[in-house]
Amino acid sequence: MDLHFENIRREYDKRSLSASDLTPTPFDLVTRWLQDAVEAKTYEPTAVIVGTATPDGHPSTRTVLLKEFLNNEFIFYSNYESRKGQQMAANPHVCLTFLWHELERQIHVEGDVRILEPELSDAYFATRPYKSRVGARISPQSRPIPGRSFIVQEFMKESLKYAGRTVPRPDTWGGFAVKPVRIEFWQGRESRLHDRFLYELRPDASWSVHRLAP
């Protein structure tokens, strides 16, 4: 069955982005836009699409939740042995996309990823709800399983094992930190004449910024 969507259109007319809104580095603007998304009560304001690729260039994406923007790095948590974890271990070049429909905004990030320090992963893991900590321990993320009953049974067994006790962070789970080298800010505008500004990291650690054609 063919599907046609050419008649689905929306005009973007809520906001603008001009050179006067920019900051010397992109990080203040990243902070401002993330805060705007939270304050506007957008749906999942910290959701971010993470793009990874194998060493020979086969890409994949998935959506995770940003948990910290710390020391100018974007931090999220996941299983090191998942598909994304394995791809990031083999090829540290990644991209991120934040999309806030309600604000008609996007941020696109390119950079290199590293595994977060264990003590920081431990500290975050301790803040997670009990069931989330148990789930992180028993899920062989991205691998085939016999059925849902398998993962439910494993969850029940691990829950009983740690009932009333501290659930330790598994060695296969922790944080990833993305250090950006390119950050683009996209603001939807009327007639598809969108505002786009690209920051790029220079060798001397300063940032260049250019307006891009929509």
UniProtKB/Swiss-Prot annotation:
Binding site for substrate: R9, R10, E11, Y12, K67, Y124, R128, S132, R192, L193, H194
Cofactor binding note from Swiss-Prot or TrEMBL: Binds 1 FMN per subunit.
Sites where the protein binds FMN: 62-67, 77-78, 83-84, 106, 141-142, 186, 196
Pfam families, per the entry: PNP_phzG_C, PNPOx_N
Molecular function via GO: FMN binding; pyridoxamine phosphate oxidase activity
Pathway the protein contributes to: Cofactor metabolism; pyridoxal 5'-phosphate salvage; pyridoxal 5'-phosphate from pyridoxamine 5'-phosphate: step 1/1; Cofactor metabolism; pyridoxal 5'-phosphate salvage; pyridoxal 5'-phosphate from pyridoxine 5'-phosphate: step 1/1
Cofactor: FMN
Catalysed reactions, as listed in the record: pyridoxamine 5'-phosphate + O2 + H2O = pyridoxal 5'-phosphate + H2O2 + NH4(+); pyridoxine 5'-phosphate + O2 = pyridoxal 5'-phosphate + H2O2
EC number, UniProt record: 1.4.3.5
Entries under InterPro entries matching the protein: Pyridox_Oxase, Pyridox_Oxase_CS, Pyridox_Oxase_N, Pyridoxamine_oxidase_dimer_C, Split_barrel_FMN-bd
Keywords: Flavoprotein, FMN, Oxidoreductase, Pyridoxine biosynthesis
UniProt subunit comment: Homodimer.
Role according to the record: Catalyzes the oxidation of either pyridoxine 5'-phosphate (PNP) or pyridoxamine 5'-phosphate (PMP) into pyridoxal 5'-phosphate (PLP).
HAMAP family given in the database record: PdxH
Protein name, entry field: Pyridoxine/pyridoxamine 5'-phosphate oxidase
Gene source species: Porphyromonas gingivalis (strain ATCC 33277 / DSM 20709 / CIP 103683 / JCM 12257 / NCTC 11834 / 2561)
Taxonomic placement: Bacteria, Pseudomonadati, Bacteroidota, Bacteroidia, Bacteroidales
Gene: pdxH
